[in-house]
């Protein structure tokens, strides 16, 4: 023990006098270095503008002394002066009127004349108000008595002095973890005392502070070794496991779990009890000023954090206690070979209390406030200790996870356990264990069995810690696709709804995924884009255009296809009879005619080309397409059976029957083929007929055969053969409509062939005779429609036609007279539908009354020029009719002005026509007419009326 410790009163007086001399200069120097003023515990209010701090004292007699204001926030506490009092000179006497005078509870001995010598310090009883007492408790809630700890440490230090070995170790540790500063040893020699007076107060404070820290660490090291030896003596096997909670009997000291370096991860070390620095109390004043410690009050969030960390460490400690003996032996050898750390690392919750007590010790031992350099050195030492704690904790966590990873905390294991678990029928009425709140009833839905709120699910966030294993990742996780929905920040829309917006105070409001705040000040973005990109506040969802959604879905599909494992597919082997488009199929060989230029076509190719050309055939392109058709027909020159010519005539005939409206155009096509066909074409089966005659033979034979069959046989019938009345829009309905269209198209096509003189009058006479035969015996509606269609087509021309049969001559008009006689009988007697009956009446009127001048005569295919000419004619007719009507109206109005309108009585309900005021204004004023009317009546109906009628 040093002389300074043996004579605390003398040491305190020396320190006090030195503090009084150096305090003003040190304060001025330190504040000039900082460059700002310290108000209320070092808060920076006005930088570079010192108030009452750059002077050795307050010129206005401020009562707070030459130091800072309020001295760490304690207004009237004597302990805040740190063992020294301000000098009582004239400048420190409070002036009334400038500051509020607080009561002075004692008269310090410095209140003497300024020039008098200082007297010996005499302890004076302090009359300060009793501050609020804060009770310090342990983790278990028991009361912590700091005085008893202080006494116990004093007794332990008296029994045994500190060995030099820990001091050397402490010195090495302090050199490695803190700033390298030599620690001066206090001496009792007068020469050293005189040299200490010359040293600045800041340097003395720094050295004293470092010395006390080293003494405290040495005491902790000694106590830890004693506890290790005691625990190893009681338990024959040294404890090499993780730290356990060791409690001393008869003491209520808080327990502190110690965290060692990675080399000592599994060593069993007793917890360090919270100490009170007795060494500092011995070197400070002894009973002059009694200090009341005011520990720091923790906030609610800090307490929750401390409790959570405490639980986690307790769980880790319990898990480490259950380790096997071989692991203990390995850790024992590792610990024996590893060096013992010089300082103990404590839990985070007890570090706060230790810091508070170290602040109390500093205030009790140091006569002045530690400078910035002292605080920095202490912070460096604390950071070094925290670094050691973090390293040991990380290594301990890694070891623990490696040892406890036995496959029970994987996703696959949890899923297997859930399969065997009994499901909960009603999650809202189920009794959950203590500490777990059930789900809120407002999330209950009738059509969904299990619904939970976020509050219920967040309870299991820290309790269920599992990691993904390879089996689960391969089977399930690889198939999970997170859509970009939500957002372009690589997060879903729902992920930012709960926890990511707390800093903005929105709680559960979803912010714009597309950074709306950054875009709000942009003037270059268009209004349309800003509407798309901003949030929809009603739905809390960002607007996405349809194109973006389609792109996103397309990208998702591509991503899913990429993620799917590619299946091995056998290469495609094309079959011999596979379907190939005609334009892709290439001929291996081309058949050429003997001339070497003309290409010979098969029957299928002829039909395909004819269908294509007939679909393109119009009156505007008639010449070009008909020339191509004629070229195909001329291929029959190199044939002996006329196969190509038959195919051409067949396709034209089918197309003409299927499209009755274009029958005249197809008849013109047949006429061009007959006229321009190569006369060298022959057919072995039809001798004597070549070229055009062969075409007419094919055409007449095809029309005659189809006309004899009729089109009634193509109509759908019942099983017994009776006609079927198909339902609307059914397959039978379309089949019947197609058969009717083709039958009437055939009759119309035959009629246009006759009008182009491709069929003779004799052929047409045979057609009418066949129809008249069918009309005599209960004719069908199909036969009557065919007769009406043929008469509309060839009636006018057949009326004047005649032909010879042997020596007799037959007139067409005579045949038509007998035909219309049969039709009159059918109209009067036969039971036919009204539609057919009116058609027969119309065709009868067309012959007898209109002389075959029908309005529908020109209803056929027309060119674009013909359509325009027809529209122009109709427009001119309409204009002429309007001009005629205007002329008629003008003439009638001219006569109406000459009439005298009868006066309309009020009781009469007859409305009279009012004429324009414009004409009445221009007209000259009426002349007086004689009362007696003349015999000439101005009213055209006056001859039918009497005089009494006019008067009325």
Swiss-Prot record:
Residues 1-77, 115-389, 481-575, 870-952 are annotated as: Disordered. Pfam families: eIF_4G1, MIF4G. The modification Phosphothreonine is found at residues 181, 888. Residues 29-46, 65-74, 175-191, 879-894 have a biased composition (Low complexity). Residues 7-16, 47-56, 154-166, 229-244, 355-368, 908-922 have a biased composition (Polar residues). Residues 188-299 are annotated as: Interaction with PAB1. One of its GO terms (molecular function) is RNA binding. InterPro entries: ARM-type_fold, eIF4G1_eIF4E-bd, eIF4G_eIF4E-bd_sf, MIF4G-like_typ-3. It is found in: Cytoplasm; Cytoplasm, P-body; Cytoplasm, Stress granule. Residues 607-850 form the MIF4G domain. SMART domains: MIF4G. The modification Phosphoserine is found at residues 163, 195, 503, 883, 892, 896, 908, 948. GO terms for cellular component: cytoplasm; cytoplasmic stress granule; eukaryotic translation initiation factor 4F complex; mitochondrion; P-body; ribosome. It comes from the Eukaryota. Residues 140-151, 218-228, 246-276, 283-294, 309-333, 504-521, 532-569 have a biased composition (Basic and acidic residues). One of its GO terms (biological process) is positive regulation of endoplasmic reticulum unfolded protein response. Keywords: Cytoplasm, Initiation factor, Phosphoprotein, Protein biosynthesis, RNA-binding, Translation regulation. Component of the eIF4F complex, which composition varies with external and internal environmental conditions. It is composed of at least eIF4A (TIF1/TIF2), eIF4E (TIF45) and eIF4G (TIF4631 or TIF4632). Interacts with PAT1 in a RNA-dependent manner. Present with 9760 molecules/cell in log phase SD medium. Component of the eIF4F complex, which interacts with the mRNA cap structure and serves as an initial point of assembly for the translation apparatus. Stimulates translation by interaction with polyadenylate-binding protein PAB1, bringing the 5'- and 3'-ends of the mRNA in proximity. The formation of this circular mRNP structure appears to be critical for the synergistic effects of the cap and the poly(A) tail in facilitating translation initiation, recycling of ribosomes, and mRNA stability. TIF4631 is probably essential when TIF4632 is missing. Belongs to the eukaryotic initiation factor 4G family. This is Eukaryotic initiation factor 4F subunit p150.
């Amino acid at each position: 023990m040093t002389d300074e410790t043996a004579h605390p009163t003398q040491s305190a007086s020396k320190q006090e006098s030195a503090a009084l001399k150096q305090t003003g200069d040190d304060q001025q120097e330190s504040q000039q270095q900082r460059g700002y003023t310290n108000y209320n515990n070092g808060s920076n209010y006005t930088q570079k503008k010192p108030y009452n701090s750059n002077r050795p004292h307050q010129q206005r007699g401020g009562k707070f002394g030459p130091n800072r204001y309020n001295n760490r926030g304690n207004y009237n506490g004597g302990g805040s002066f740190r063992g020294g009092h301000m000098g009582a000179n004239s400048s420190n006497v409070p002036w009334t009127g400038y500051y509020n005078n607080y009561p002075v509870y004692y008269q310090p001995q410095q209140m003497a004349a300024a020039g008098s010598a200082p007297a010996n310090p005499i302890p004076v009883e302090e009359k300060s108000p009793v501050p609020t007492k804060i009770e310090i408790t342990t983790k278990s809630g028991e009361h912590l008595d700091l005085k008893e700890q202080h006494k116990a440490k004093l007794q332990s230090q008296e029994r045994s002095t500190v060995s030099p070995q820990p001091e050397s170790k402490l010195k090495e540790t302090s050199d490695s973890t803190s700033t390298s500063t030599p620690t001066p040893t206090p001496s009792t020699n007068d020469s050293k005392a005189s040299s200490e007076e010359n040293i600045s107060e800041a340097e003395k404070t720094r050295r004293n502070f470092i010395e006390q820290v080293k003494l405290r660490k040495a005491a902790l090291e000694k106590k830890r070794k004693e506890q290790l030896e005691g625990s190893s003596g009681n338990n024959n096997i040294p404890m090499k496991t993780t730290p356990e909670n060791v409690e001393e009997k008869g003491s209520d000291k808080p327990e502190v779990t110690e965290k060692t370096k990675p080399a000592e991860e599994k060593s069993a070390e007793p917890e360090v009890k919270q100490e009170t620095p007795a060494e500092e109390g011995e070197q400070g004043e002894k009973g002059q000023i009694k200090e009341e410690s005011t520990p720091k009050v923790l906030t609610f969030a800090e307490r929750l954090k401390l409790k959570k960390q405490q639980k986690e460490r307790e769980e880790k400690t319990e898990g480490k206690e259950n380790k096997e003996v071989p692991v203990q032996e390995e850790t024992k050898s590792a610990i024996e070979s590893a060096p013992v750390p010089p300082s103990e690392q404590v839990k985070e919750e007890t570090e706060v209390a230790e810091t508070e007590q170290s602040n109390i010790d500093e205030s009790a031992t140091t006569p002045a406030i530690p400078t910035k350099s002292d605080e920095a050195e202490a912070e460096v030492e604390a950071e070094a200790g925290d670094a050691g704690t973090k390293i040991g904790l990380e290594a301990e966590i890694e070891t623990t996870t490696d040892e406890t990873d036995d496959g029970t905390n994987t996703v696959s294991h949890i899923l297997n356990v859930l399969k065997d678990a009994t499901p909960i029928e009603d999650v809202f009425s189920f009794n959950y264990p203590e500490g777990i709140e059930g789900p809120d009833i407002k999330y209950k839905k009738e059509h969904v069995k299990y619904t939970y709120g976020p509050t219920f699910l967040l309870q299991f966030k820290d309790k269920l810690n599992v990691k993904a294993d390879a089996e689960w990742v391969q089977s399930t996780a690889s198939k999970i696709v997170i859509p970009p929905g939500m957002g372009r920040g690589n997060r879903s829309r729902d992920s930012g709804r709960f926890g990511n917006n707390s800093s903005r105070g929105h709680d559960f409001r979803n912010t714009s995924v597309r950074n709306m705040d950054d875009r709000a000040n942009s003037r270059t973005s268009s209004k349309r884009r800003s509407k798309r990109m901003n949030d929809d506040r009603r739905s809390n969802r960002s607007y996405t255009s349809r194109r973006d959604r389609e792109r996103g879905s397309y990208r998702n599909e591509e991503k899913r296809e990429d993620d799917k494992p590619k299946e091995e597919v056998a290469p495609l082997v094309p079959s011999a009879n596979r379907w190939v488009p005609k334009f892709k199929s290439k001929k291996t060989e081309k058949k050429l005619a003997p001339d070497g230029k003309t290409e010979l076509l098969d029957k299928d190719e002829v039909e395909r080309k004819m269908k294509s050309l007939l679909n393109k055939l119009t009156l505007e392109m008639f010449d070009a397409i008909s020339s191509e058709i004629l070229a195909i027909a001329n291929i029959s020159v190199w044939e002996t059976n006329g196969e190509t010519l038959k195919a051409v005539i067949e396709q034209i005939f089918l197309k003409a029957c299927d499209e009755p409206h274009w029958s005249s155009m197809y008849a013109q096509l047949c006429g061009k083929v007959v006229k321009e066909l190569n006369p060298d074409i022959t057919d072995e089966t039809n001798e004597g007929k070549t070229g055009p005659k062969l075409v007419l033979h094919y055409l007449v034979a095809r029309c005659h055969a189809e006309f004899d069959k009729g089109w009634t046989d193509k109509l759908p019938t019942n099983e017994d053969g009776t006609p079927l009345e198909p339902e609307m829009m059914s397959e039978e309905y379309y089949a019947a409509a197609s058969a009717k269209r083709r039958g009437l198209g055939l009759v119309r096509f035959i009629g246009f062939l006759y009008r182009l003189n491709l069929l003779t009058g004799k052929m047409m006479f045979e057609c009418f005779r066949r129809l008249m035969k069918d009309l005599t015996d209960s004719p069908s509606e199909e036969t009557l429609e065919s007769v009406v269609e043929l008469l509309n087509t060839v009636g006018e021309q057949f009326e004047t036609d005649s032909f010879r049969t042997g020596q007799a001559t037959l007139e067409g008009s005579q045949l038509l007279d007998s035909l219309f006689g049969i039709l009159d009988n059918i109209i009067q007697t036969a039971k036919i539908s009204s539609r057919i009956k009116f058609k027969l009446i119309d065709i009868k009127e067309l012959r007898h009354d209109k002389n075959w001048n029908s309005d529908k005569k020109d209803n056929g295919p027309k060119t674009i020029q013909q359509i325009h000419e027809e529209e122009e004619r109709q427009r001119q007719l309409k204009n002429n009719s309007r001009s005629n009507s205007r002329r008629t109206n003008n003439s009638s109005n001219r006569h109406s002005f000459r009439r005298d309108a009868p006066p309309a009585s009020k009781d009469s309900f007859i409305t009279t026509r009012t004429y324009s005021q414009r004409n009445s204004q221009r007209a000259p004023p009426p002349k007086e007419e004689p009362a007696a009317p003349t015999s000439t009546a101005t009213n055209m109906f006056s001859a039918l009326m009497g005089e009494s009628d006019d008067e009325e």
